[in-house]
Structure formats: structure tokens, C-alpha cells
């Protein structure tokens, strides 16, 4: 449900004159190789990186980063209204409670009513922390339908990160190295798929010359538990 708030702010940025990735998105769409679900995820990925600074969702939500609701138009008591107008964290949780599910039902009408009645006594930060499992690092989950191309999306993220990292080498938001983990019990089915990352054509998302340069620079190393243990300094 939280994604709806993020998506709205993301789309506002993409259509604004402040958006710095319009050319990248336009190229990807015109190239026609990535699927709609992949492109949508790339838009979100770039928004979280560039605009949100790769901050934890808990932190972004608490800062009111995705607030869009006009509190002045809400049916609230003066006490509740003043609280929500002056506390971005409170306003964020209130807006969250009013989100609609796919079937049209409100996400949490009980939470909405509780906020209205107890606006000044709620520990909003604690509730938001629980919503995001008390995670204090950037923990983003991109959920795509089966067969939508999750492996190639991972490859696209890697190449885009490297592209921006080269443009801004001192910007900690963009990564220079990557690690992908696969559960050992499923490695026979997952690892072959993950190896497709090495075969991804970066010209699907970046201009030919830029794509060739990145392709020449990137190095892949596939490790498994047995070979990694042999080369480690672990003493049993």
C-alpha cells in the first residue's frame, strides 16, 4: 500500500523540470527492449537513488517525504489538525491509514479514527518503525510478476548504478561494486538464472558507446560455498 504514496511523488518528479533522468527513461522506452514492469521499477529505482538519497524507507516516511494529503481539508478537530499540520510524521501515518486497497476498501479506518481521537499522545515514530520492521538501512523490495524479467532488471540496476557512479564518483548514493546472494538450497535453480546478468546487453538502457565502455569495465565473479571456503581464512 505504501507504494501508492511513493509512486505519486515519483511521477510528479518525473514530469517536473527538476527531473535529471528524462533522457535515460526516454532512451529506454524508445529502445523497446525492457518490459513495462521493468521500466516502472527503473523509474522507482532512480527516484529512490537520486531524489530520496537512498535513505531507508522508515526515514523517508517519517520525514513526510511522500505526504500529499491536504490536512486543512480533512474532517478533524482543531487539536488533531494542528498536530498533523506541524508534525510530518503524524501526517504521514494519517495519510497511510486512508490509503485504499485494490478492492476499494480503506487500509486502516481504525487507525484513522484513533489518530483523530488521540493525535497528541501517539508515538508516531514507533508505529512507523514497526511498519518497516525497524530496518535502519535502505531495504527496497521490487516485486514483479512471474516472467517479467527480474534477473535482467537486476542487471539494469547494476549498469545504471555504475553509469551514475562514474558521473559522480564521490557520491555515496551510487555503488561501484555489487554482491548478489542466492540461497544455497536453491542454487541449482537460481544460479543459472542469475548468470544471465552477465549476458545482459546494457545498450538496452544506455546509449551504445556508454554501454560498451561499461561492459568492458565490469567484471563478474561467481562464487559457491565450497570454493569460497577454500580461499578464505576461516579456521574450523
Predicted regions and their residues:
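RecA-like P-loop NTPase motor core of helicase/translocase proteins
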Residues: 1-236
